[in-house]
UniProtKB/Swiss-Prot annotation:
It is a multi-pass membrane protein. It comes from Methanocaldococcus jannaschii (strain ATCC 43067 / DSM 2661 / JAL-1 / JCM 10045 / NBRC 100440). One of its GO terms (molecular function) is transmembrane transporter activity. Probably part of a binding-protein-dependent transport system. Probably responsible for the translocation of the substrate across the membrane. It holds the Pfam family FecCD. This is Putative ABC transporter permease protein MJ0876. The keyword Transport applies. Its main location: membrane. Keywords: Cell membrane, Membrane, Transmembrane, Transmembrane helix, Transport.
Length: 351
């Protein structure tokens, strides 16, 4: 099958799955397929209670999953192309670490907690945005000071470990309730997304996708190496800064809403390359987007339908608890990549 045919199939799947998730994400006897169709076409099911469940409980997490799949996966692809490293992602380049660091400071340090109290329930969200801006500025400074792309990722990774150490110090001296609050942010969950959150997330996603479209030609030039790209007149420094800016921008905009969902930025590009059998970003970017949506929505369904048997694992009398989507994605994605590498069927290269 040619590349366009594969993209069409992925596109159709990425459209069908969110609608399927709307039906499966809860009691299927309470809300039927007909209710879902009526709500999507008419804006109401004819039942106020069902409307509230769909609008406030089921719909926001699914839209969040779609937006994360569309954006964070492509942010990972851009960083992998820039650094010519399949492990490059918003997490491994330190972008997520900056967000987590600022959130940790706000949660664990009382003076900062009081300062952010003016934002009420959105204090952690605002802290995450500040962390995103901090990460963006830090990465741009590194990119301006370090000439080689590999040097940038090494410095960013070292800073990521530095932030990890600081967070460990803060956690070691923190109260249990604050540790639980921070842990709840880091594991990655779509459950806290509200319909009001969807609007800024969508706006940021649109800005990011438009930016990526303008960078496709430059990303293709980088496939042949920076020296080769320079010979074709590509401004390497400008391209590097733009890639880092957009990757930091979307990570800082999305992560505060959902916590740490990092692996999608590695696994979606990894699976897209052998599937469409090309490194041309004209095809690779949409393939990564569609795969990102498929993976995120599928993991969202699994996280709601399957529960972790806490009482069997730890021998304690507690009800089974839903799996956070970040854990589902990491477990299934990790096993899939290990299987593909072990079988030797997917020999992936950047160029």
């Amino acid at each position: 099958m040619n590349k366009v045919g594969i993209l069409l199939i992925l596109f159709i799947l990425s459209l069908i799955l969110p609608f399927t998730a709307l039906y499966l994400a809860g009691d299927t006897h309470l809300i039927t397929v007909k209710d879902i169709i009526n709500f999507l076409l008419k804006g109401t099911t004819g039942n106020e209670f069902k409307d509230i469940i769909i609008k406030d409980v089921r719909l926001p997490p699914i839209i969040g999953a779609v937006l994360i799949g569309l954006t964070i996966s492509v942010a990972g692809l851009m960083l992998q192309t820039l650094f010519r490293n399949l492990l490059a992602s918003p997490y491994t380049t330190g972008i997520s670490s900056g967000v987590l660091m600022v959130v940790a400071l706000v949660i664990f340090i009382d003076s900062l907690s009081h300062l952010f109290e003016i934002f009420g329930e959105k204090s952690i969200l605002v802290a995450g945005w500040c962390g995103g801006i901090f990460s963006m500025i830090l990465l741009i400074i590194i990119a301006l000071r370090v000439r080689e792309a590999n040097g940038v990722i090494i410095v960013a990774l070292l800073l990521s470990y530095f932030f990890m150490g600081l967070r460990a110090y803060l956690i070691a001296n923190a109260e249990e309730l604050k540790i639980q609050e921070y842990w709840g942010f880091t594991i990655g969950s779509l459950s806290k997304i509200t319909l009001g959150d969807v609007i800024p997330m969508t706006i940021c996603s649109i800005i990011f996708i438009i930016g990526v479209m303008f960078l496709i030609k430059s990303l293709n030039a980088l496939l042949f190496g920076e020296q080769y790209a320079k010979s074709f007149g590509l401004d390497i420094k400008k391209t590097r800064l733009l890639v880092l800016f957009f990757a930091s921008f979307i990570t800082g905009a999305i992560i505060p809403y959902v916590g740490l969902i990092a692996f999608i930025g590695i696994i979606a590009p990894y699976l897209a390359r052998p599937l469409i059998k090309t490194s041309d970003h004209r095809y690779l970017v949409p393939a990564t987007m569609f795969l990102g949506v498929i993976l995120m929505v599928s993991c969202h369904i699994l996280s709601l339908k399957y529960y972790l048997p806490i009482h069997y694992l730890y021998g304690i009398n507690r009800p089974a608890s839903p799996l956070p989507i970040g854990a589902v994605l990491d477990i299934l994605g990790g096993m899939l990549v290990v299987y593909l590498v072990y079988k030797g069927e997917k020999k992936i290269k950047i160029d």
